[in-house]
């Protein structure tokens, strides 16, 4: 038995274990499956709270020091005078101590492994707690820390108990030797930096403390020491075997027996008992402390993310008299994971991974995850058609896997290893001195999590190059758990250490021939000689801010090429932290906002959801692209559609198809049809469509699939899929619009004034701009109607460019270098003409920078007898400048409309390369809802393919994109945080005839596909505008 050390704190610290890669722990207990130590089978079967497991979460005492050497020896037995109360779990940076640091690649400390700075912030935690005398007499008492960042020493009642590092896996210690009846005292010294920090260089906030649960666990003297269950299925998946191994510990285990029982809906499905002593292993014998049983199961209910059917497995340890000593339990899902014929399969079916990467992040609590937030994440993922999650880039809170088992998500469980900032990246992976530390991070993860059916892939870590240590760990995992594939992206995504080709940010059709680690196009990669593995992108579609363009292109490739089996979007949640400004107002902060250096600014804002889990518009794009139903318009007369189910295992029995036929948003007919579709089958539906009278407008068939009843992860009437088609309509000839009076032109010294009844337009003769429009005596413009060729840069436009590190290839730098953000108009022509039935104003502008013309814009404005302003605009773009972000017009309107209505794509923000989720229809939204509150302000709020826009007295018609905003493009460009934006008078109207895509294959290189770049050098557009 371990004997607690009487050494003083200073002597223990003098060894500097935190700078020795060969020391990852002292006296930490071996890894095993999670324990609860129930006293009876009924409680274990019901997963009730166990009386032998006691939470130590709550208020602890805390003292903060700049370095561990500053901590007085006396602290191990008594609190320091400056101690304050702090919650556990928490990150101390979120409690007002020290500084959170956000950095992506660059290490937050000087790179000199295994050494860390002498200034090493240190948190000293203490807690007094009570222990019942019966606990001490009846067995062993352990303490379990589920997560401490980055390393810690533990004392109990003044005696040193051990040391541990690896922030993301449990550390468990036996306290039995030093506990006493009544009051006891824990003291935990936590270091911000240790040599393990060189293995934890993930793209995230760097924070410290006891950030996961702490608990006391009581085990009887003889107890279950580990358990492992493996499901085996026959070729027809209608018979199964559950292979179970249990390990025991304690002096009397040889006299004991374990009963293993499989339960389903409260009933025993299979049971078996065995005494310890495995079969003969080798010439030296067997495992005396282990036992194995096999439970046969006929017609098992199979687990998948679609049908998360679970059984409950209990392990009851009894002594020689039949008394229960210890009970453990876990959920079991019968499923088989394999790679065959180049495809990743579950239960014999090739998967299409609809995945997302997820960091454990909470805006107020940092890296502390509560159950409600975990459940909310899963519910949102399921509602938006995700079926998989990658635990990027470390093992998650233990509860996460249980919830994934029960809700149904496929999981990639990833080891807490990333050395992205090393040069070369593989430096530690090829160093045998670091093998023990890397090994523990992989092996302990597998031993903790291997009973979870949701985990279908193990990952050796992230962005650590490729080295011999990876090859060794790959072999260990494959030997220890041959039931799951292993993936690892480092070294080029297709090394011998991965069963899956798992690149990050490879593009559909474009090669990226980087030296040493090329990224081939996806279509090319799967066709390369001797490459037979499935390809699943471990990261793709970088969702940073206003991004996610081209996502539909990936999904077209996934659906057309079976070995392209999907991928994991980067990433789930914006990693912003809540901070208060000088006035006490909360805002979401990113890198640098805490004075943290180094920092990577807003690069932590890559989420599909905001920090509070409000969706970004990109989330709806993912939902539509990934939907589990596909539709085909078979014929229009009769009106017939096919609905195909992409579900592999689930019979559709909770879905209803609801359809309507609408003309310009007005519903002409509607109906609903119950769906009963077997997996991967099709249901044909004939829709009773009425005869359409000739009338203005387009006719659209809209179909939605809704879940009629609530599920574990969605409310009733949740829409899970949709589609629409434009239907042929009778030819309609619109009658001519008859005006009541012709407009009148007056040529004045400074303006061309056009009048029509209660309206007047002023075209400034010096600038050529429409500077004012009076309607019923009210001025409606605050700023003139002007050409608009730029946008407030998106994150994807900026790329990695910074003030101190310019990337000349970034779109924004190319636009700046060309002078496109510094344009000055030169008027070449401004003339008016009175016609018999109308007035025309013709202008020609050269938009110049440094004396060079970049754009020529010719506008012909016509005001007709109905008082409608018609615009006809021709734009020429200089041949030697980069393609512009937009071609359109902008003005500041005097009114601030409450709402806006439009006929076009909506209701949510959409851009030319991100509009799969947008639907043709008539939409009405409040003005504020037309703005997307990205934390880092950029151009936002566009609605594409608009035919009609109405707000206040204004009505525009044509074929254009638009945005309405309280914020000018200049303010959006100049402001660093959304909370600093100030609403401007009136509102800004942007009318775009052409708008470049947002891109999103990645956010550090130009990624807008060629078809969404404004390649043409001559463009023309027209629209009409009237006021009532």
Swiss-Prot record:
One of its GO terms (molecular function) is beta-galactosidase activity. Na(+) binds at residues 203, 603, 606. Its EC number is 3.2.1.23. Its cofactor is Mg(2+); Na(+). It is an enzyme of class 3 (hydrolase). Substrate binds at residues 104, 203, 463, 539-542, 606, 1004. Mg(2+) 1 binds at residues 418, 420, 463. It catalyses: Hydrolysis of terminal non-reducing beta-D-galactose residues in beta-D-galactosides. Keywords: Glycosidase, Hydrolase, Magnesium, Metal-binding, Sodium. The active site is at residues 463, 539. InterPro entries: B-gal_small/dom_5, Bact_Beta-galactosidase, Beta-gal/glucu_dom_sf, Gal_mutarotase_sf_dom, Galactose-bd-like_sf, GH-type_carb-bd, Glyco_hydro_2, Glyco_hydro_2_AS. The record marks 359, 393 as: Transition state stabilizer. PANTHER family: BETA-GALACTOSIDASE. Homotetramer. This is Beta-galactosidase. The lineage of its organism: Bacteria, Pseudomonadati, Pseudomonadota, Gammaproteobacteria, Enterobacterales.
């Amino acid at each position: 038995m371990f004997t607690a050390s009487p050494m003083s704190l200073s002597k223990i610290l003098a060894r500097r274990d935190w700078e020795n890669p060969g020391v990852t722990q002292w006296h930490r207990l071996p890894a095993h499956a999670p324990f609860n130590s129930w006293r009876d089978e009924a409680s274990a079967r019901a997963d009730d709270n166990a009386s032998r497991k006691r939470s130590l979460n709550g208020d602890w005492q805390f003292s903060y020091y700049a370095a561990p050497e500053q901590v007085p020896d006396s602290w191990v037995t008594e609190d320091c005078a400056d101690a304050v109360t702090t919650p556990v779990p928490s990150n101390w940076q979120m409690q007002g101590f020290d500084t959170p640091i956000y950095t992506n690649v660059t290490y937050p400390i000087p790179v000199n492994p295994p050494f860390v700075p002498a200034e090493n912030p240190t948190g000293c935690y203490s807690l007094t707690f009570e222990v019942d005398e019966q606990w001490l007499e009846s067995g062993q008492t352990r303490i379990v820390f589920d997560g401490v960042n980055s390393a810690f020493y533990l004392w109990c009642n003044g005696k040193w108990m051990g040391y541990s590092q690896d922030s993301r896996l449990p550390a468990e210690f036996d306290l039995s030797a030093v506990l006493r009846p009544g009051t006891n005292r824990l003291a935990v010294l936590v270091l911000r930096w240790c040599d393990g920090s060189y293995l934890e260089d993930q793209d995230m906030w760097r924070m410290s403390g006891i950030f996961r649960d702490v608990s006391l666990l009581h085990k009887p003297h003889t107890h279950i020491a580990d358990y492992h269950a493996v499901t085996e299925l026959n070729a027809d998946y209608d018979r199964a075997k559950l292979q179970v191994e249990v390990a025991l510990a304690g002096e009397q285990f040889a006299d004991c027996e374990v009963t293993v029982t499989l339960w389903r809906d409260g009933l025993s499905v299979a049971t078996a008992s065995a005494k310890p002593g495995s079969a003969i292993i080798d010439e030296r014998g067997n495992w005396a402390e282990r036992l194995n049983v096999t439970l046969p199961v006929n017609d098992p209910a199979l687990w998948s993310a679609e049908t998360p059917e679970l059984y409950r497995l209990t392990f009851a340890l009894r002594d020689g008299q039949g008394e229960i000593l210890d009970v453990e339990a876990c959920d079991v899902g019968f499923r088989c994971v394999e790679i065959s014929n180049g495809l990743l399969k579950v239960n014999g079916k090739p998967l299409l991974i609809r995945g997302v990467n997820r960091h454990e992040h909470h805006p107020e609590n940092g890296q502390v995850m509560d159950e409600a937030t975990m459940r909310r994440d899963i519910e949102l993922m399921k509602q938006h058609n995700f079926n998989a999650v990658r635990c990027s880039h470390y093992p998650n809170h233990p509860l996460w896997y249980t919830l994934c088992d029960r809700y149904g998500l496929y999981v990639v469980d990833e080891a807490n290893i990333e050395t992205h900032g090393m040069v070369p990246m593989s430096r530690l992976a090829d160093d045998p001195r670091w093998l023990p530390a890397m090994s523990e991070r992989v092996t302990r993860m597998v031993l903790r999590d291997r009973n979870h059916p949701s985990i279908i892939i193990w990952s050796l870590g992230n962005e650590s190059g490729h080295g011999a240590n990876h090859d060794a760990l790959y072999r260990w995992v494959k030997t220890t758990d041959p039931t799951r594939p292993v993936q690892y992206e480092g070294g080029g995504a297709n090394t011998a250490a991965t069963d899956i080709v798992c690149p990050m940010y490879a593009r559909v059709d474009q090669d990226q021939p980087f030296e040493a680690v090329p990224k081939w196009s996806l279509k090319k990669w799967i066709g390369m000689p001797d490459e037979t593995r499935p390809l699943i992108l471990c990261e793709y579609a970088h969702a940073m801010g206003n991004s996610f363009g081209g996502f539909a292109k990936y999904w077209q490739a996934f659906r057309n090429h079976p070995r392209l089996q999907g991928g994991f979007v980067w990433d789930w949640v914006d990693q912003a932290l809540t901070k208060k400004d000088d006035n006490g107002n909360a805002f979401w902060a990113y890198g640098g906002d805490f004075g943290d250096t180094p920092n990577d600014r807003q690069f932590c804002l890559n989420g599909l959801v905001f920090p509070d889990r409000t969706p970004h518009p990109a989330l709806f794009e993912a939902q539509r692209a990934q939907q589990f139903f596909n539709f085909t318009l078979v014929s229009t007369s009769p009106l017939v559609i096919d609905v195909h189910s992409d579900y592999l295992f689930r019979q559709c029995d909770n879905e209803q198809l609801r359809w309507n036929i609408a003309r310009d948003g007005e519903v002409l007919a509607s109906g609903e049809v119950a769906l009963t579709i077997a997996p991967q089958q099709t249901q044909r539906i004939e829709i009773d469509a009425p005869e359409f009278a000739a009338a203005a407008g387009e006719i659209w068939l809209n179909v939605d699939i809704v879940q009629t009843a609530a599920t574990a992860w969605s409310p009733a009437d949740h829409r899970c899929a949709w589609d629409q088609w434009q239907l042929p309509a009778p030819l309609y000839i619109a009658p001519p619009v008859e005006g009541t009076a012709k407009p009148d032109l007056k040529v004045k010294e400074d303006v061309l004034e056009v009048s029509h009844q209660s309206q007047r337009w002023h075209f400034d003769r010096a600038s050529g701009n429409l500077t004012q429009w009076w309607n019923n005596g009210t001025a409606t413009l605050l700023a003139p109607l002007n050409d608009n060729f730029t946008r407030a840069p998106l994150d994807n436009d900026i790329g990695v460019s910074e003030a101190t590190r310019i990337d000349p290839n970034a779109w924004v730098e190319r636009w700046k270098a060309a002078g496109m953000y510094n344009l000055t108009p030169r008027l070449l022509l401004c003339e008016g003409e009175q016609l018999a039935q109308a007035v025309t104003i013709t202008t020609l502008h050269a938009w110049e920078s440094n004396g060079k013309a970049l754009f020529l814009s010719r506008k012909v404005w016509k005001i007709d007898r109905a008082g409608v302003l018609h615009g006809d605009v021709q734009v020429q773009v200089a041949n030697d400048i980069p393609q512009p972000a937009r071609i359109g017009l902008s003005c500041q309107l005097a009114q601030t409309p409450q709402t806006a209505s439009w006929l076009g794509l909506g209701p949510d923000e959409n851009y030319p390369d991100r509009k799969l989720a947008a639907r043709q229809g008539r939409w009405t939204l409040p003005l504020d809802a037309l703005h997307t509150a990205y934390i880092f302000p950029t151009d936002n709020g566009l609605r594409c393919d608009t035919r009609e826009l109405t707000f206040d007295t204004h009505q525009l018609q044509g074929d254009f994109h638009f945005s309405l905003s309280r914020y000018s493009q200049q303010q959006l460009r100049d402001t660093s945080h959304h909370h600093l934006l100030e609403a401007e008078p009136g509102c800004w109207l942007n009318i775009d005839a052409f708008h470049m895509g947002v891109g999103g294959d990645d956010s550090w290189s130009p990624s807008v596909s060629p078809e969404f770049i404004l390649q043409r050098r001559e463009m023309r557009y027209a629209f009409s505008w009237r006021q009532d």
